[in-house]
Amino acid sequence: LYSTTDPKQIISTIKKRYKPSIIYIADLDAIIDNKVNTKIINDILIDFPEINFWIDTGLNILKSKKRFMNYHSVFCTENSIGFDIDSNNKKKYVCSFDYKKRILGNVNLPRLLKYLPKKIILMDLEQVGSSKHANFKMLRKYIKYSTKYELYIAGGIKTTLDLNRAKSLGARGVLVSSILKKDCLPRLLIQKRKNQPTN
């Protein structure tokens, strides 16, 4: 799919082919070494204002050039020592529940509920980047919260059957890096997405 390692060129390719409204970015340097790729992220936010970016910097602060309307910080439970989120800024945040047979981090879900933003990613780390399929058992476990929160599933989405099953179970959306990497989305679905008006 990509003939480059330049993030901006990759995003341009994805934008042209799939017309996404949201792109998730995990800054691995920030997550692993606490070194945020500030310049690259700022450049991306400037160059693609029409796309909303969910960006995981491992709870590190991004020093942005300005207040970007398309920047949404991702908070992950795996690195949490018991965080809450300012209720005044919930709309700009996304919470990722990192899951490995249980939610990782110092998280008491019932106590945390009142602090959570509307958008929540259920990310099964055992499925991410693996040959395993999505953990729909995890989704069914937490789907009771879908009336109040928008649930997105990550890890193991390999086919359009997985997409349809996630939707039927109540997921608001999915992270689909494996499908894009393998170029598995059918042309009809791509064309349908391209024909949709931009929000």
Where are these regions (language model features)?
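Active-site pocket-lining/capping segments in soluble small-molecule metabolic enzymes
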Residues: 1-4, 76, 84-86, 90-100, ...
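Conserved N-terminal beta1-alpha1 strand-loop-helix module at the mouth
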Residues: 1-49, 66, 95-134, 158
